[in-house]
Amino acid sequence: MSYLSRILEEKEREVGELASEHPARRYAELQGSLAPTRDFTGALRRTGRGLRLIAEIKKASPSRGLIVPDFDPVNIARRYGELGAAAYSVLTDRTFFQGSIDYLQMVSRSFQLPVLRKDFIIDESQIFQSRLTGADAILLIVAALDSCQLGDYLQLAASVGLHVLVEVHDRKELDRAIEKGAPIIGVNNRDLKDFSLKLETSLSLRPFIPSDVLAVSESGLKSSADIALIEQASFDAVLIGEGLYTSPELGRITWS
């Protein structure tokens, strides 16, 4: 069984638990009192000063295990803000990434930068939960959704004020994202089936992303040379997690 299949199987169980919290009903009751979401899409637009950084706050991963033993999401977010991050990505998957929706809430309440909820969204209840807990944007992974779900979830997210980053890994997934009107497309250099990495994935797919769609390169960026390649390919932003922890070189870059 692939990594993605295992994750989605577990996610089905989590969604069953979430149903008992009735997030759709809670959203209907509370929507009038919720603060407006911050402009995640606008934060990623290049202004001629280089790539924008989505800095990922991640405790662990299936491929590497525990990454940050003394994990403090607020302190990590503060450091990334000082580096010049344009937005945050917070892992909320519990089982495989040791994440928590509480981490998202902590970061969202503590800082003004927009926050992306990084998880495996497979049900409408997760979208309502995201809005209720302070996310400004969500990730939709094309490989985890059928075409109807992708279109429906894009519309639902927009209706509750959430921005959406749609993640793809190959040309077929990219075409599906474009067909459904994805406003931001993230090319994941990591294959979610086996978690292998190839930076070439971003470089090969970039020419097929329309000019009016924001393009993000995700995962596997480990050096200033990698960043230069992505910038030359005319991406708007990068999403970096482990690299900011493990590469002193990336930690010294001052992002625009």
UniProtKB/Swiss-Prot annotation:
Gene Ontology MF terms: indole-3-glycerol-phosphate synthase activity; phosphoribosylanthranilate isomerase activity
Gene3D superfamilies recorded: Aldolase class I
Pfam family name, one: IGPS
Record pathway: Amino-acid biosynthesis; L-tryptophan biosynthesis; L-tryptophan from chorismate: step 4/5
Top EC group: lyase
HAMAP family: IGPS_B
Protein name (database record): Indole-3-glycerol phosphate synthase
Organism name: Pelodictyon phaeoclathratiforme (strain DSM 5477 / BU-1)
